[in-house]
């Protein structure tokens, strides 16, 4: 509850931001609070206290990392299909050959696609913390069996219907629709053409 209250408080300041740096600062704070809150509803055997990557330090982070990578590829396909340049974004900067626009557009899809998928897997005991993961060096990763299970669950999720858009679409179709809406917004200089999804 505290994390949600803090996020709502910080959210009120977002429209007052006068620079991308300030806006990204708010995004970073909210992201940290969000993952703290997420950790409180994760089963104890999948203990998760904060986001870790390169390497992921625990099974929950291992699944988030793999899921976000796959979602990144979905967004990249949508961006290219919409005729957009993946390296020209609004918030994330172009550095080290990173597709900034893809990083911009992925944010609204992380929770409804990947976070919900991973939570579903652990809460329904569909993946085993001891049997489906392996440790290598300092990192934790899905092993062969775990990866196969996760990929199957991901494919079902991305092809499943959702009601985030005005019409029934699969998540993959909705991602492509949002990329096209973004392209239309840029081409017509009309912010009304892009409506971010709201998590339900």
How should these model regions be labeled?
Residues 1-200:
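Active-site helix-to-loop segments that bind/position phosphate- or nucleotide-bearing substrates
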């Amino acid at each position: 509850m505290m994390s949600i209250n803090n996020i709502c408080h910080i959210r009120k300041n977002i429209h007052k931001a006068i620079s991308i740096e300030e806006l990204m600062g708010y995004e970073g704070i909210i992201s940290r609070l969000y993952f703290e809150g997420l950790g409180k509803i994760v089963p104890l055997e999948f203990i998760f206290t904060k986001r870790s990557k390169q390497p992921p330090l625990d099974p929950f982070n291992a699944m988030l990392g793999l899921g976000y990578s796959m979602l990144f590829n979905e967004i990249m396909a949508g961006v290219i299909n919409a005729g957009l340049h993946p390296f020209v974004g609004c918030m994330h900067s172009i550095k080290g050959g990173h597709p900034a626009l893809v990083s911009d557009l992925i944010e609204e899809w992380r929770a409804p696609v990947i976070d919900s998928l991973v939570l579903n897997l652990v809460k329904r005991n569909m993946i085993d913390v001891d049997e489906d993961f392996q440790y290598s060096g300092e990192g934790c990763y899905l092993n062969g069996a775990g990866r196969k299970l996760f990929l199957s669950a991901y494919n079902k999720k991305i092809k499943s219907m959702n009601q985030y858009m005005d019409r029934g679409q699969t998540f993959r179709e909705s991602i492509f629709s949002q990329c096209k809406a973004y392209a239309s917004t840029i081409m017509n200089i009309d912010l009304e053409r892009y409506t971010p999804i709201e998590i339900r």
